[in-house]
Curated annotation (Swiss-Prot):
SMART domains: Pro-kuma_activ. GO terms for molecular function: serine-type peptidase activity. It comes from Dictyostelium discoideum. Induction: Down-regulated in grlA-null cells at 16 hours of starvation. SUPFAM superfamilies: Protease propeptides/inhibitors (SSF54897). This is Uncharacterized protein DDB_G0291952.
Amino acid sequence: MTEINSGAPVSHMAHHIPKFAKYTKDIGLADPKKEIQYSIVLKIRNQEWIEKQVYVQNPTCENFGKLLGRGEINSLTKPSQAHFDKVSNFLQSKGIQSTRDGDNLKVLSSIEKTQDLFKTQIHKFTQPSGSQDDTIYKRVGGFQVPPEISDCVDLVVGF
């Protein structure tokens, strides 16, 4: 599995406090039956091509000023249908439904299934002076993208 740790060195993760935690109170483990929504961002295609596009801004380069339109860029970079299908089918095999949302998959799942899928713990946070509607569900620590889909997934956001 691919370990995700917010970019901080693993040795420092135990001391890393997310910004939202400074303004919220950790109530503890979230109710495993509660449903949460999050997004899975799929890897874009043609990353090497994207990195070379900086040269369209350099007057000394032969591609200077050769800008592409949004549609052309999207057709060259959007995640492949095979990646959408692979991740969507994998989630479905785990009893998790997803819908396509642009270049991402929007997921609605129980906390229990989400924790099992990503090998993480999700806690419930509230704002100490807020109302019940101010509840936030966030993972505590790192998580792992399952190896079956790690070649397709760039980022998971929302928990």
